[in-house]
Amino acid sequence: MAKMRVRFPMLVLLLGVVFLLAVSIGIAYGEKDVIKNPERPEERQEEERDPRQPPRSRQQEEQEREHRREKERDREPSRGRSESKQSQEEERERRKEHDREREQEQQPQYGRRHEEEEKGEEEEEGQARRQRPQRRREEREQEQGSSSESRRQSGDERRHRHEKREQREEREQEQGSSSGRQSDYGRRQRHEGREQREEREQEQGSSSESHRLRNPYYFSSERFQTRYKNKNGQIRVLERFDQRTNRLENLQNYRIVEFQSRPNTLILPKHSDADYILVVLNGRATITIVNPDKRQAYNLEYGDALRLPAGTTSYILNPDDNQDLRVVKLAIPINNPGKFYDFYPSRTKDQQSYFSGFSKNTLEATFNTHYEEIQRILLGYEDEQEDEEQRREQEQSHQDEGVIVRVSKEQIQELRKHAQSSSRKGKPSESGPFNLRSNEPIYSNKFGNFYEITPDRNPQVQDLDISLIFTEISEGALLLPHYNSKAIFVIVVDEGEGNYELVGIRNQQRQQDEQEVEEVRSYNARLSEGDILVIPAGHPLSINASSNLRLLGFGINADENQRNFLAGSEDNVIRQLDREVKELIFPGSAEDVERLIRNQQQSYFANAQPQQQQQQREKEGRRGRRGPISSILSALY
């Protein structure tokens, strides 16, 4: 019994060990089957299937899964319980998928299309993401290629510039001392290039009007700029001469001013930072010049001229009842070249008083009174809330009229009471007016008259080195070609119409042999009242009058100027040439040249169309002689 008791526990223990071994073997065998199960590799193959292959339908997938399950059941009949659980789960999944498919079939057609489009967009985005790295690599390669190409080009450009610099240095070394002359020559070439461009612009003008506008020496009356204008008159200033062309740079400090006023009007007192030479071209005037110790008034008529120094206070009256007053002035600015300003002591609606520029304390100390009284008497009230009485007082003082105001008969009589007239004959005074036609003309015949006042004959214009000319050309007459040796003349057309021809020189540069070629250039324009014409020194000129023409001229740099005529019986420089020189320089013989010069028996002025008129008379004479014969023959036949 005791042995049985001992063996029974051992038997139980052995059975337990065997059971444990069997269980462990079964577990191991089950894991081995799980590892060897072909379902998972197939599922991985499904997951790793190439996305480019067309997707299979759900029915095909279910058939494949069912086929795999049948194989597993045949291969492993011992996995009944676990297989039943898995089959139940798969059945539930199939039902869910079947329900989802039924719901999708019940959705509208456009929803399915929308899903398909979304899937297509997702596929395109995925493809774009896959292609993006490749694009970036290509862009980097292109950038690297372009940068290398640009570096190569920049290197070539640097080498090219270096070679050009070396060539330039070699040329400079070879030329040596002539480099200074070449730099001057280059500047002159640039200057002449600008002139050539201007002249080409003039040649391009097809119409006469465009040609007039492109002529640098001609300024129409429309080129005046209005400084002030009201119902009583206007003040105009011509544009600067040097703005048109650099050939007139020596005239940059000279301006032409013109003012016109109605009858019985007064141009208010003022002074300017410019010297003036004024000339009356229409009507009558009374000018009053105010100095610190005295006041002088002069009566001016047509052709009278007067020097008005800079800083001199003056005012001009038009005393005539019918005629307008027209005055032309040559202004010579003092402070700034080409710019001048007028300073008025009184305030108007268009002009402030120079007293308004001072402070209140300065004005009170200057006039030794309160500022209110100074404002009431000199400055006027600028407050819009001034009372009616003050406003009426300002209207009576003509502050609302402007710079040119009307005056009464009584005021005109008082202003002219002590005025002096200009000197018609004898020696001109040092301060009073003088008339341009007071002396005999220097050139005169039946076709015209030429008056001139030179600096050595008049002390008023001597320090300014200015001369004045006044020319009268009859209708159909010609001022013969001539040129001035030193003076530059600014001509103002006072009255009439005509044509002028001015001869200049154009410089051209030949690039091959680097030589300058001078070509003759002709400038011409139609002249009318108010136009301005500039005649440079040394430039031949002729003027043809289509109606009675009157010209006023200001000569700049006029001291010792000489006028040289190119035709006519007197003062003809061509006539004074030696006979041998005439033989050399002209195509014709010396006898032919002298005979040609002697054909013109007039001097300075001549008939503008002598040959045409003579031919016309000859034709009329021949027609008159043939008249009776032709009438008889026509009667006979």
UniProtKB/Swiss-Prot annotation:
Pfam families under this entry? Cupin_1
Which parts of the sequence are annotated with region: Disordered? 33-221, 384-439, 606-626
Biased composition regions of type Basic and acidic residues, renumbered to the chain? 33-105, 136-174, 184-203, 389-417
Question: Which CDD domains would you find in this protein's record?
Answer: cupin_7S_vicilin-like_C (cd02245), cupin_7S_vicilin-like_N (cd02244)
Residues that carry a glycan: 544
Q: Which UniProt keywords apply?
A: Allergen, Glycoprotein, Seed storage protein, Signal, Storage protein
Q: Please note every region of biased composition (Low complexity).
A: 606-615
User: What InterPro entries does the entry give?
Assistant: Cupin_1 (IPR006045), RmlC-like_jellyroll (IPR014710), RmlC_Cupin_sf (IPR011051), Seed_Storage-Functional (IPR050253)
Q: Where is the Cupin type-1 domain?
A: 217-375, 434-594
Q: Which cysteines are joined by disulfide bonds?
A: none
Q: Which GO terms describe its molecular function?
A: nutrient reservoir activity
* Secretion signal span: 1-30
Q: Does the keyword Glycoprotein apply?
A: yes
Report the sequence similarity comment from the record.
Belongs to the 7S seed storage protein family.
Quaternary state and interactors:
Component of globulins complexes which accumulate in seeds.
Q: Which PANTHER family match?
A: OS03G0336100 PROTEIN-RELATED, VICILIN C72
Function comment: Seed storage protein. Accumulates during seed development and is hydrolyzed after germination to provide a carbon and nitrogen source for the developing seedling.
Q: What else is known?
A: The variability of the residues taking part of IgE-binding epitopes might be responsible of the difference in cross-reactivity among legumes.
What is the designated name of this protein? Answer: Conglutin beta 5
